From Swiss-Prot:
SUPFAM superfamilies named in the record: Actin-like ATPase domain
Name used for this protein in its record: Glycerol kinase
Assembly: Homotetramer and homodimer (in equilibrium).
Binding site for sn-glycerol 3-phosphate: 14, 84-85, 136, 246
Alphabetized PROSITE patterns for the sequence: FGGY_KINASES_1, FGGY_KINASES_2
NCBIfam families linked to this entry: glycerol_kin, PRK00047.1
Gene that this polypeptide is encoded by: glpK
Length: 502
């Protein structure tokens, strides 16, 4: 009797690494998770030890095997999904990083980004990469490492160093240095990749003086990149055959295969991505243009809007204000509020993301009266998440001149039924919550399984992650628009308050 086969997804996130084993039905068989150290050398800087990340991945692979009893030779293929933009530069010979990984959140390269803007490169970079010039993306992080580690530039030019985002680093380690590759979705977040011509952009590399020799080869999101070295996978030689940045993996895991389909992951922040099909569309309203995924010889583009504070607003109610003991409790309090929704919380704790991009804005509250209760405040905080999502959905509809019919949702805060119902009401469209909320890891597993024939095609995948629950709008049009108008007023006032005094 032949043994059952499985797919393993490695989900390397910002605070922890996870390994999840999925079966043919797309169900989770086992998972293992390990946190690692956040390094803050200075205010606003965030770094990780890339070796510690690698150790944590080795540990969770073992944990997933131990928990399930599945053997390494029962894994048909491995899919990798990762925190995007985070940058590692390492020695080709020893495999040791020459500096800590600089994390996507880190602002240590902001002066470099400002310098590029002042030199007039904004439009050029936007047209080529689809991105706005920002310290968020990998380009300035690579430049910073080459500038600040003695002899690094010279060694990079000699071909002694390699660069990669976390996907590249993990494949290189798992294959024991046999494969130095990345995928379309991760390459598109480096600010070095021309997403129209699908190649590293020579002009941008020249502007930043980054040697081409250090860059990985860019491949599709679903193909065999290499096999695990047996001593790194507990004796198994298993193909690594699917890869995508976390938000793009969630798009794929949500089965958003058709142009116009949109998903939102309600995590710490909120990431809304729309599949725009094979045509690249540049946003005129401060959304990012990126690559969703590339499979079967075709590349599918996407528009992305990022909200900095979503689930973390609920954490703030819990840890900062001590208004709730745990996150799910926020739903009960919100339902107990009986005010007329006239309180607005604008959670701009780290500035406002898309479509405002105002880094000076700070959190504010409007509409308080003597009668305002804790319940009202908690409800207004949950509603602020939904209002921010509407800001982006409205912008996407303007950019693409389409009408979005349904929003597919996942992530921790998507479990909050009050928030999901209010989201449906304020958007006036259906909200489809995935049955399996592990959409990021599932997306990586789907990409890996497709390329080795574990799943036949996209049609087979469509049967595996149905909608768990549908939330339909129940608010009348005039009420909906009146509430949203109040939100826009609150955001405007927040921005006025943030203006720098002369």
């Amino acid at each position: 009797m032949s043994q059952e086969k499985y797919i393993m997804a490695i989900d390397q996130g910002t605070t922890s690494s996870r390994a999840i084993i999925f079966n043919k039905k797309g169900e989770k068989v086992s998972s293992s998770q390990k946190e690692f150290t956040q390094i803050f050398p200075q205010a606003g800087w965030v770094e990780h030890n890339a070796n510690e990340i690698w150790n944590s991945v080795q540990s969770v692979i073992a944990g997933a095997f131990i928990e399930s009893g599945v053997k390494p030779n029962q894994i048909e293929a491995i899919g990798i999904t990762n925190q995007r933009e985070t940058t590692v530069v390492w020695d080709k010979k020893t495999g040791l990083p020459i500096y800590n990984a600089i994390v996507w959140q880190s602002r240590q390269t902001a002066p470099l980004a400002e310098q590029l803007k002042s030199q007039g490169y904004v439009e050029k970079f936007h047209e080529k990469t689809g991105l706005i010039i920002d310290a968020y993306f990998s380009a300035t992080k690579v430049r910073w490492i080459l500038d600040h580690v003695e002899g690094a530039q010279e060694r990079a030019e000699k071909g002694e160093l390699l660069f990669g985002t976390i996907d590249t680093w993990l494949v290189w380690k798992l294959t024991d240095g046999a494969a130095h590759v990345t995928d379309y979705s991760n390459a598109a977040r480096t600010m070095l990749y021309n997403i129209k011509e699908l190649k590293w952009d020579d002009e941008i590399l020249e502007i930043l003086n980054i040697p081409k020799a250090i860059l990985p080869e860019v491949r599709s999101n679903s193909e065999i990149y290499g096999k695990t070295a047996p001593f790194h996978f507990y004796g198994g030689e298993v193909p690594i055959s699917g890869m995508a940045g976390d938000q793009q993996a969630a798009l794929f895991g949500q089965l958003a295969f058709e142009p116009g389909m949109v998903k939102n992951t309600y995590g710490t922040g909120s990431f809304i991505i729309m599949n725009t099909g094979e045509e690249m569309q540049l946003s005129e309203n401060n959304l990012l243009t990126t690559i969703g995924y590339g499979i079967n010889g075709k590349v599918y583009y996407a528009l992305e809007g990022s909200i900095f504070i979503a689930g973390s607003a609920i954490q703030w109610l819990r840890d900062g204000l001590r208004m709730v003991e745990n996150s799910p409790e926020s739903e009960k309090y919100a339902r107990d509020s009986h005010n007329n929704d006239e309180v607005y919380v604008v959670p701009a704790f780290t500035g406002l993301g898309a479509p405002y991009w105002n880094q000076n804005a700070r959190g504010s509250v409007f509409g308080l009266t003597r009668g305002t209760s804790k319940e009202d405040f908690i409800k207004a905080t949950l509603q602020s998440i939904a209002y921010q999502v509407r800001d982006i959905i409205d912008t996407m509809q303007v950019d693409t001149q389409t009408t979005i019919q349904v929003l597919k949702v996942d992530g921790g805060a998507a479990m909050n039924n009050f928030l999901m119902q209010f989201q449906a009401d304020i958007l006036g469209i259906d909200i489809a919550r995935a049955k399996n909320l592990e959409t990021t890891a599932l997306g990586a597993a789907f990409l890996a399984g497709l390329s080795v024939g574990y799943w036949k095609d996209l049609d087979e995948l469509k049967l595996l992650n149905e909608t768990g629950e549908l939330f339909e709008p129940s608010m009348n049009e005039s009420r909906k628009e009146q509430l949203y108008k109040g939100w826009k007023k609150a955001v405007k006032a927040t921005q006025v308050f943030a203006e720098v005094d002369d």
